[in-house]
Regions:
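N-terminal pre-catalytic segment of deacetylase/amide-hydrolase enzymes
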Residues: 3-40
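Active-site beta->alpha N-cap acidic-glycine motif
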Residues: 27-98
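Structural preference for beta-strand elements that scaffold enzyme active sites
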Residues: 38-40, 65-69, 86-92, 154-158, ...
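Active-site beta-loop-alpha junctions enriched in small/polar residues
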Residues: 44-46, 71-75, 92-96, 160-162, ...
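Acidic (Asp/Glu)-rich catalytic clusters
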Residues: 56-62, 77-90, 103-115, 148-149, ...
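Active-site gating loops and adjacent loop-to-helix segments of metal-dependent hydrolytic enzymes
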Residues: 100-128, 253-260
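Catalytic domains of cell-wall/extracellular-matrix polysaccharide-remodeling enzymes
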Residues: 133, 138-210, 217-225, 232
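C-terminal domain-boundary segment and adjacent tail
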Residues: 255-300
Length: 300
């Protein structure tokens, strides 16, 4: 996903509109008990590199991961499409290209979304300061439509680096696309909502858009300990965690300063022998985003 703006929390939770027994929780609507702990483990940055594609599909098919998010504008997105087998994959809506030596840009004619290098801006703030909102809407819609054209059964939307979630005028587009394509969203929690100063969770709820109750980032070398803590502290409801798996190659080492963290995430998802047992003992129920999408489309 990349870095969020200063002061914005990566984790938190949202409270459902009503906590009365007559209103089913999201978990209950998905067929679980109200006090069950349900977890989506999403792999961000599918399509960003061959190393990411290999690590993410391995994590989905042979590991603990339950969903992934595709960066349509990236050079390796077509290869990700060629390797797709009906996995739970959403669109990682992308308006930034954060690396110095590896660049990508819009798939539509969008001059306001280009920086001096001919790619997307490196920072979230640069997008916020210079992007034309009509160009943003066209670009993000085109990213979703291209993923569908490539054959992906899109399960959800989320935002690379949080760019389209954390400002009201950009969030309006994010929410409109979720309604138009009938897709659930990744949304940060209450602490982030207080920082950014607008009620994005309630706005999504009012439009019938489904989103997980809680949101946690697990990142950095040694992320196993972070996941252990997260599992031990899970609240009832649906929690999304996201990671960035990649295999260790010269490619990923050449462009990603955090390559070691990404390799560690792949090991965590596929090679750790204790974590699956820990999750089972904790009564954690893994799911992808597809059940949330189907719930939203059913009008629940």
């Amino acid at each position: 996903m990349g870095s969020l703006p200063a002061g914005v929390s990566r984790e938190g939770n949202h409270l459902l509109t009503a906590n009365v027994s007559s209103v089913p929780t999201l978990a209950e609507q998905l067929g679980f008990a109200a006090d069950d702990r349900v977890v989506i483990i999403n792999c961000d940055d599918l399509g960003s590199s061959n190393a990411a594609n290999t690590g993410i599909y391995d994590s989905l098919r042979h590991g603990l991961a339950t969903s992934a998010s595709l960066m349509v504008p990236c050079p390796w997105a077509r290869e990700a499409a060629a390797r797709y087998r009906g996995d739970d994959v959403g669109v990682h809506l992308t308006l930034n290209s954060e690396y110095d030596n590896y660049r990508w840009g819009p798939i539509t004619h969008a001059p306001s979304l280009l920086d001096g290098d001919g790619g997307f801006p490196r920072t979230v703030e640069d997008v916020w300061d210079h992007a034309d909102l009509d160009e943003v809407r066209r670009e993000l819609s085109a990213q979703i439509e291209r993923a569908i054209l490539w054959g992906f059964d899109i399960t959800h939307l989320d935002s690379h680096m949080g760019t389209v979630q954390l400002r009201p005028e950009f969030f309006d587009i994010y929410l409109d696309l979720a309604v138009e394509f009938a897709l659930p969203l990744r949304l940060s929690g209450a602490s982030t909502e207080r920082v950014v100063g607008f009620p994005f969770r309630q706005l999504a709820r009012d439009e019938g858009v489904v989103f997980p109750d809680h949101f946690i980032l697990v990142t950095g070398v040694g992320s196993r300990r972070a996941i252990e803590r997260a599992i031990g502290n899970l609240r009832p409801g649906v929690t999304e965690m996201y990671v960035h798996p990649a295999i260790d190659t010269p490619e990923v080492r050449s462009f990603a300063p955090d390559w070691a963290s990404r390799v560690d995430d792949h090991h965590l998802m596929t090679l750790d022998t204790e974590l699956p047992t820990m999750m089972k003992r904790a009564g954690v129920h893994p799911i992808g985003f597809r059940p949330l999408r189907d719930l939203q489309r059913a009008g629940a």
